[in-house]
């Protein structure tokens, strides 16, 4: 037997966050090692460091945390992938830096390409976060949520590339774009 339950789910990080963004902090907790639990494995055990990082972020007044990998490169949020925009170029860490291959991450990379927004996968440092013109997180629950500050360094309101991608993402998710209707299940 199978039971399927459906209910409305508000924005994971809040409706206001989708417009105004969230404050995030870089966590002292590192993302798990490739040698401990491979990033492609989505199990409850693989979220332990994320739980600790989220708790730390909340204690410091942040909505979310950004986790670094063992080498000190930007990895991901506690349950989200991260993107930055600098000089009109969209960047996100490569999977080889130890992050989960997010469905929403892949969607945003595809949409960016289709919208002629330059998008690359490259290793990012904490400094890259601090000098970003725009930043946002993606995930099945987080959808596409702008970041307005990182470690209390102000990035500002949702930027133009973030806004374009967010609008397109929601239009696709709600079946308003015929060329992506095969994505809707």
Describe each region flagged by the PLM.
Residues 1-185:
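Helix-start/capping segments and mature chain N-termini
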